[in-house]
Every structure is written in C-alpha cells, then in structure tokens.
Amino acid sequence: GIPVLQSFMNSYNSLYSLYFKKAHIACASLDLEDIRHLVPGTALSVICLYEYAIGFYVPSGNPKGITSLNALSGKNITIANREKGSTPRIYLDRFLLGSQISPASVSGYSTELVSDISTAAAVANHKADTALGEEYAAHQSGLLDFVPLETLPMYLVMETNALSQPGFAALLEIVRSEDFRTILQGQTGYDVTRTGELFSL
C-alpha cells in the first residue's frame, strides 16, 4: 500500500497547500472557477466526491422561523460563524457582500468556530440561534433541525500529471466504484449522482 498522511483543513487552506506543494491532493467544496483561481498556473484534475446541501442548523421546531440568509440581518438572530476559508464562511460572506449587508450588523459574526460539529453544538447549547453547515452535523446532534439552502459539490483536487501515478489512478478507481457510492449513500445528506465525474482545469 501507499502511506497516506491526512490533515484536516478548510477548502481555502487545502487548495493553498496544494498550490505550494505541501499536499498532493486537496479536498474542497468550492466551484470550479474558484478552484482555478486559487491554484493558478497549474493543470488540475478535479474529481467530484459527492454533492450535499448547505443550510441552517436551528433548534428543533425552528422557533425563530429562520428560512433564508436575509434573516441574519435581524437583531434577534445570533449566528455561530465559521473560520475564514471554510465553505460556510465563504458562502455567507458572498451573500452579505452581494446583498450589501454589513457583517457588523450580523449578531455573532465575529464568533469563529472551526467545524460544523462545533457550530451545531453552539446552536444545540443555545449559545447561538443558528449556524451554516452540512446536514450531517444537525443529524448527529439529535437536537436540531436542518433548513437546506443550496446544493454544493465536494471535490478532490490534484495536479493532472499525478493521475498517471498508480496511487492516484487507484484513488479515481475507488471513487468511481459501487462500493464507494454505497458507503456515501449511507451517510446523511450525500448525493452520489455526480460521484466520480472528472474535470480538467
């Protein structure tokens, strides 16, 4: 077998590590244009792992009726935010900029946590009214509802020349296997319709 060292990073930092050759493969939940811009001057191969819904974690019953990002500008809504470079943070910041909403007007915006599990826990423990993230964290909590907003892709990103190497070619074969799809389908919120699709950037 081939030894694999894994490091948990957000999408931005994963691509940064790939660009500076500190990693051979990055896992990123950004669109293809973002990936291209963050790793310039490099031929890339991008494999779709799965698609998932990003949405709100809310207490059971959604007592404050949070159904859209516009709700975050309300003074009675406090958010548990993610760190810069994470997909939920990028998603939120783009919305705020596009809607001309000042981050300073969003209660809790400066509270940065480093995982979906931690933001979901903040909502479950009544330290925040809501947070953005993947459905699985709400499901694991058992105390939260999930309000989906949009479907996003999760990609594996590598330099194109790596695909000619046995370990990387084997990885693509695994991702395209029925066994891998079956495992993903057993996880909450993962859509395998596009699993195994390969893109060249």
Labelled PLM ranges:
Residues 27-39, 120-150:
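A ligand-binding cleft/hinge motif common to bilobed small-molecule-binding domains
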Residues 60-67, 101, 161-166:
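Short helix-loop capping/hinge motifs at secondary-structure junctions, enriched
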